[in-house]
Regions:
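Conserved catalytic core of the tyrosine transesterase superfamily
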Residues: 1-293
Length: 293
């Protein structure tokens, strides 16, 4: 088969099965569209052909986020195709898809961060000690290292190197990465591990999971959402911590590819949305503060 999509999909060792399935569907849609325009082999795909396809998707009223996802699949395919010699060039170079669906990832405001991390609401001040230590450690880790919810819930005691202040994270597609720990995260984690966690465990329910619920079982994504609901001033999605982490890194001058590595993104396009978030925030600051804005 000229497109050799099965070989491409087999090469995707750093993505989940669900992502690979989406790539397969998006590639097949592109191949079928290309055939209708008399383009039957990947070598015949030009940059103009890609642009025409994206324009066609827009005319068909596909959501901007869907177009961005389809573009990501094409980028990865043609990068692979050029590397193994299926094509002589990469027609997706300099091709950019529309970002998002009009709504950018939510970034927590400084006051929200302060309430969540430094001065919890009065209603949670009377929590029992162990749960408070756990919640503090969870929130510091979410904001300080930008972990996904699934990644945080999967952490074990062996995930950490406190001598180097690093955490080993198992991300999408079982891809491992090392992420630095903030000083406040280290302090909160040490308090939880030494003082809080033992209170939740007994000999009958001893295991390696770092975070556990009141029954001594591993913390679940649902448990984590409830934890955040108790601390937040307004409804807050756990993923907002990851968005805030990435945006604050870029605001502080971090390189885009460094942020990509810290987040565990397989494709740089997934990280680029945060540059857009940063630009939008700068525009709002300018509009709100400059007398001639």
């Amino acid at each position: 088969m000229p497109w050799d999509t099965e070989a491409f999909l087999s090469s995707l060792i750093s993505v989940s099965d669900a992502t690979a399935s989406v790539y397969k569907r998006d590639l097949n849609a592109f191949i079928n569209w290309s055939a209708e325009t008399d383009v039957h082999e990947p070598e015949d795909v030009s940059r103009r052909h890609i642009r025409h396809y994206l324009a066609w998707l827009q005319e068909k009223n596909y959501a901007r986020r869907t177009i961005a996802r389809k573009t990501s699949a094409l980028r990865r395919y043609f990068r692979w195709a050029q590397q193994i010699g299926v094509t002589s060039t990469d027609p997706c170079i300099e091709i950019q898809a529309a970002l998002g669906e009009g709504r950018l990832p939510r970034v927590l405001k400084q006051q929200e961060i302060k309430v969540l991390l430094d001065s919890p609401r009065a209603s949670v001040l009377d929590q029992d000690g162990p749960r408070r230590l756990r919640d503090d450690a969870v929130l510091e880790l979410l904001y300080g290292s930008g972990l996904r919810v699934s990644e945080l819930c999967a952490l074990t005691l062996k995930s950490f190197d406190f001598e180097k202040n690093l955490v080993r994270v198992l991300g999408k597609g079982n891809k491992e990465r090392l992420v630095p720990l903030s000083q406040k995260s280290v302090k909160a984690l040490n308090a939880w591990i030494s003082e809080g966690r033992p209170e939740f465990l007994t000999l009958e329910r001893s295991h390696e999971s770092l975070f556990v619920n009141l029954r001594g079982k591993p913390l679940t994504p649902r448990d984590l959402r409830r934890l955040i609901d108790r601390r937040a001033l307004s409804p807050t999605n756990p993923h907002a911590f990851r968005h805030t982490y990435a945006t604050h890194l870029l605001d502080g001058g971090a390189d885009l590819r460094e942020v990509q590595e810290l987040l565990g993104h397989a494709d740089l396009g997934s990280t680029q949305i945060y540059t857009h978030v940063s630009k939008e925030r700068l525009k709002r600051v300018h509009k709100d503060t400059h007398p001639r804005a």
